[in-house]
């Protein structure tokens, strides 16, 4: 087995073979060292994992109340800069932590669940009882559900403490979190840059260690792109793996509840809790749920070639025009590192890949035009008076919904209209079938497929807000996975220049339906041999 330090340092570059459709990578160079400031921050602010929190509670070293106080203190210091949360439930979190401590003292740690004392951020399009749930929209300002979304309920039952509701692009429609009806979230690596979206608040909260883990939703990349931008782990499960009950619908055939963590182990732990069939969601699967964390192998038990015999395909269409040079280099280095770990890595073409983006926006907007028709401004949100019901509805929607949401509703209504249904919606569904077929055929040849999670690192706030086509192009790497209903994991794999300490880049790993366990196992091996999970943003060194 190679020495751990050597394994941490070695990321390998590539050599292209002549075939335009199939290329292999060979190991020839090394991973750049992490920026000095980043390493210093990591030493000063070691991330508290789910396991370390549980060990602290078990040993009596810290109480749930003390852990909660530490996280809330950090949240208060960093939130004025990051603005990850729409609502912080600090008093409720403190009460829940004190109650946990009482139960631990009388019933024991096992009785309170595997996530006892773990602070969780919840994207604000997931319903939470006794806590505002706005979907990032002013049309739901003041809405407070009487129930928890299934994913939230399962976390609470496992002992987790919901610290608050994280910011998002309105109803999940956006890629920067600039589209929120409440505030603009910033990237903890550089507060002049976007955290990605639409789950930007959930990603930035984990990156800034304001909470241990967080929930997001992914309709076309809304977990994976922010994970890449913020340097955290993000998981989009298979469609149906996690219940959508209590998730405010954007595009029902594409929406998935996902999660963020500062490590693959934490992400796997959360998935084990929230996954599984739910009678409240007719699309949820009854496929068996594994104890995903128990399937992960620690670094000291890894073989010298832990991925020996595995075949990995790197999607050719994700390394071409429109992708930043630094991102391509990071992904090729990561692919070469996977090869060094024993796998065979080949570049493979998916001919229908480029068709996915326009098909996605037609389908997602069409479903949104139906799903959002339920919001009328009558019981909550911004209500505008009118002479009749139609004027009241129209005025309230015009005043309560943001520009991007209105634009997508119009696009979807147009695509569904009688004169254009066949030309747009029906054709987009045919493209979706082609995309599914392409992935199915590729995943019959390869164990997983890999690509960048985004064509760039995090860009400046305001840089693309007035250019919707440029914004939509940022989803190129991710939307096809939603069209195919597949699971995907994003793990930090390197840095590009930018900010004071570099900007993170994420590697997207894509698997067959319900292969989350395999993705997490590969991601964990990759993560351990690079130690990316110990990289924390400069914000924490400064706060």
Curated annotation (Swiss-Prot):
Cellular component terms (Gene Ontology): chloroplast stroma; glutamyl-tRNA(Gln) amidotransferase complex; mitochondrion
Subcellular location: Mitochondrion; Plastid, Chloroplast stroma
Biological process according to GO: glutaminyl-tRNAGln biosynthesis via transamidation; mitochondrial translation
First-level EC class: ligase
Active site: 123, 198, 222
GO MF entry, a single one: glutaminyl-tRNA synthase (glutamine-hydrolyzing) activity
Record InterPro entries: Amidase (IPR000120), Amidase_CS (IPR020556), Amidase_dom (IPR023631), AS_sf (IPR036928), GatA (IPR004412)
EC numbers for this chain: 6.3.5.7
Matching Pfam families: Amidase
Reactions mediated catalytically: L-glutamyl-tRNA(Gln) + L-glutamine + ATP + H2O = L-glutaminyl-tRNA(Gln) + L-glutamate + ADP + phosphate + H(+)
This protein's record includes keyword Ligase: yes
Keywords: ATP-binding, Chloroplast, Ligase, Mitochondrion, Nucleotide-binding, Plastid, Protein biosynthesis
Gene3D superfamilies, per database record: Amidase signature (AS) domain (3.90.1300.10)
Entry's family note: Belongs to the amidase family. GatA subfamily.
Misc. comment: This protein may be expected to contain an N-terminal transit peptide but none has been predicted.
PANTHER family: GLUTAMYL-TRNA(GLN) AMIDOTRANSFERASE SUBUNIT A, MITOCHONDRIAL (PTHR11895:SF7), TRANSAMIDASE (PTHR11895)
The protein's assembly and partners: Subunit of the heterotrimeric GatCAB amidotransferase (AdT) complex, composed of A, B and C subunits.
Protein purpose: Allows the formation of correctly charged Gln-tRNA(Gln) through the transamidation of misacylated Glu-tRNA(Gln) in chloroplasts and mitochondria. The reaction takes place in the presence of glutamine and ATP through an activated gamma-phospho-Glu-tRNA(Gln).
UniProt name for this protein: Glutamyl-tRNA(Gln) amidotransferase subunit A, chloroplastic/mitochondrial
Lineage: Eukaryota, Viridiplantae, Streptophyta, Embryophyta, Tracheophyta
Gene: GATA
């Amino acid at each position: 087995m190679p020495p751990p330090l050597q394994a941490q340092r070695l990321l390998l570059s590539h050599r292209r073979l002549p075939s335009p459709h199939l290329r292999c990578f060979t190991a020839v160079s090394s991973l750049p060292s992490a920026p000095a400031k980043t390493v210093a921050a990591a030493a000063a602010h070691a991330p508290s994992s789910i396991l370390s929190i549980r060990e602290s509670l078990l040993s009596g070293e810290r109480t749930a109340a003390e852990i909660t106080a530490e996280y809330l203190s950090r949240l208060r210091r960093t939130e004025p800069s990051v603005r990850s949360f729409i609502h912080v439930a600090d008093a409720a979190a403190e009460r829940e932590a004190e109650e946990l401590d009482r139960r631990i003292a009388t019933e024991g740690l096992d009785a309170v669940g595997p996530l006892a004392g773990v602070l969780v951020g919840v994207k604000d399009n997931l319903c939470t009882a006794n806590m505002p749930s706005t979907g990032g929209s002013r049309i739901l300002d003041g809405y407070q559900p009487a129930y928890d979304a299934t994913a939230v309920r399962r976390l609470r039952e496992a002992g987790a403490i919901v610290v608050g509701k994280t910011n998002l692009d309105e109803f999940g429609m956006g890629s920067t979190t600039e589209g929120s009806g409440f505030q603009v979230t910033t990237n903890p690596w550089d507060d002049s840059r976007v955290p990605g979206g639409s789950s930007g608040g959930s990603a930035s909260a984990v990156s800034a260690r304001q909470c241990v883990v967080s929930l997001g939703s992914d309709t076309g990349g809304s977990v994976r792109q922010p994970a890449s931008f913020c340097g955290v782990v993000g998981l989009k499960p298979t469609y149906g793996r996690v219940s959508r009950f209590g998730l405010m619908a954007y595009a029902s055939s594409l929406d998935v509840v996902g999660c963020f963590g500062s490590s693959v182990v934490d992400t796997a732990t959360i998935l084990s809790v929230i996954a599984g069939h739910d009678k409240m969601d007719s699309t949820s699967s009854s496929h068996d749920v594994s104890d995903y964390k128990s399937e992960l192998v620690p670094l000291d038990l890894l073989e010298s070639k832990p991925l020996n015999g595995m075949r990995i395909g790197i999607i050719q269409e994700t390394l071409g025009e429109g992708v930043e040079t630094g991102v391509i280099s990071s992904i090729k280095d990561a692919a070469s590192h996977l090869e060094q770990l024993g796998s065979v890595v080949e570049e493979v073409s998916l001919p229908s890949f480029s068709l996915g983006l326009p098909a996605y926006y037609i389908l997602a907007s069409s479903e949104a035009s139906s799903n959002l028709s339920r919001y009328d401004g009558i019981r909550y949100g911004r209500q505008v008076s009118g002479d009749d019901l139609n004027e009241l509805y129209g005025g309230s929607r015009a005043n309560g919904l943001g520009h991007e949401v209105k634009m997508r509703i119009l696009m979807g209504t147009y695509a569904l209209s009688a004169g254009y249904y066949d030309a747009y919606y029906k054709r987009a569904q045919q493209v979706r079938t082609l995309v599914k077929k392409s992935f199915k055929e590729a995943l019959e040849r390869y164990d997983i497929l890999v690509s960048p999670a985004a064509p760039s690192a995090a860009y400046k706030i305001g840089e693309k807000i007035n250019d919707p086509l440029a914004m939509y192009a940022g989803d190129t790497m991710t939307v096809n996975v939603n069209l195919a209903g597949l699971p995907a994991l994003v793990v930090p794999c390197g840095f590009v220049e930018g900010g004071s300490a570099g900007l993170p880049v994420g590697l997207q790993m894509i698997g067959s339906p319900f292969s989350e366990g395999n993705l997490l196992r590969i991601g964990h091996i990759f993560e351990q041999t690079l130690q990316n999970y110990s990289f924390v943003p400069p914000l924490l060194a400064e706060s």
